[in-house]
Amino acid sequence: MAESFVRLEHVFYKYEDTEKYAVKDVSISAQKGEWVALVGHNGSGKSTIAKLLNGLLFPEDGLIKIGHFVLSEKNIWEIRRQVGMVFQNPDNQFVGATVQDDVAFGLENHGVPHDTMVERVESALNEVGMQSYALHEPARLSGGQKQRVAIAGVLALQPDVIILDEATSMLDPRGRAEVMETIRIMREQEDITVISITHDLDEVLFADRVIVMNNGEIHSEGTPKEIFEQADAMRAIGLGVPFIIELQEKLVAGGFETGSTVLSEGALLDQLWKLNSNN
């Protein structure tokens, strides 16, 4: 098996104003091109892990490795070149007067030659479907469009890892769907590792693997199907389950046979049709 591209080993971290560990003995790994979702209630440690992965925080104990680099003050900038981060509020990330200026900002800071910069900006905006808005002011965009521009700014830097820190939490359903589809396509085309930090359990269904955090520790880990088959365990720590899982539970409670757990409405309809056809 290939070595993990992202690795946390027995990581501990606590903030200065508290005695309680925000992250306690956490070990996580992710392969190149894998999508890993971290879920948990507020205070579970998931956003602290996002900041640790990008070197915004340093662990009190344990090891964090991205690619060939172990996180330290010496190589923090090597880590940040490999890791792009998209935050909850895209307005906090905008610095340019136009969309293309904003996407170019990070490249300028990295000293990328002008001709290369122009190519990367155009390519990144095309990838997120925002090339026609290149000369627009970011402030005039919708929430979903703003977040796609923020993603383009990260893509232009050609990172190996993208961290989504509650990146869709302020968007309406349409904007959320736009952003998640953009990330899905981007990951397939660029083989980028995606670490999504979220409390949106429908968003978790996009992931290859889910890590459930509770009180700074890993509560459980598995595929989305494996995690949501433990619906009662999720509810016991203050989390819910996606709508599609709730729908199956209600059908079973109403006396309908639904078969094995599925994660999409289309798959559920197919399953119900087959079961009904056999009766």
Curated annotation (Swiss-Prot):
It is found in: Cell membrane. It is an enzyme of class 7 (translocase). Residues 6-240 form the ABC transporter domain. Its EC number is 7.-.-.-. SUPFAM superfamilies: P-loop containing nucleoside triphosphate hydrolases. InterPro entries: AAA+_ATPase, ABC_transporter-like_ATP-bd, ABC_transporter-like_CS, ABC_transpr_CbiO/EcfA_su, ECF_ABC_transporter_ATP-bd, EcfA_1, P-loop_NTPase. GO terms for molecular function: ATP binding; ATP hydrolysis activity; ATPase-coupled transmembrane transporter activity. Its main location: membrane. ATP binds at G40, H41, N42, G43, S44, G45, K46, S47. SMART domains: AAA (SM00382). It is a peripheral membrane protein. GO terms for cellular component: ATP-binding cassette (ABC) transporter complex. It holds the Pfam family ABC_tran. Signal peptide: none annotated. It comes from the Bacteria. Keywords: ATP-binding, Cell membrane, Membrane, Nucleotide-binding, Translocase, Transport. Forms a stable energy-coupling factor (ECF) transporter complex composed of 2 membrane-embedded substrate-binding proteins (S component), 2 ATP-binding proteins (A component) and 2 transmembrane proteins (T component). Belongs to the ABC transporter superfamily. Energy-coupling factor EcfA family. ATP-binding (A) component of a common energy-coupling factor (ECF) ABC-transporter complex. Unlike classic ABC transporters this ECF transporter provides the energy necessary to transport a number of different substrates. This is Energy-coupling factor transporter ATP-binding protein EcfA1. It comes from Listeria innocua serovar 6a (strain ATCC BAA-680 / CLIP 11262). The lineage of its organism: Bacteria, Bacillati, Bacillota, Bacilli, Bacillales. The gene is ecfA1.
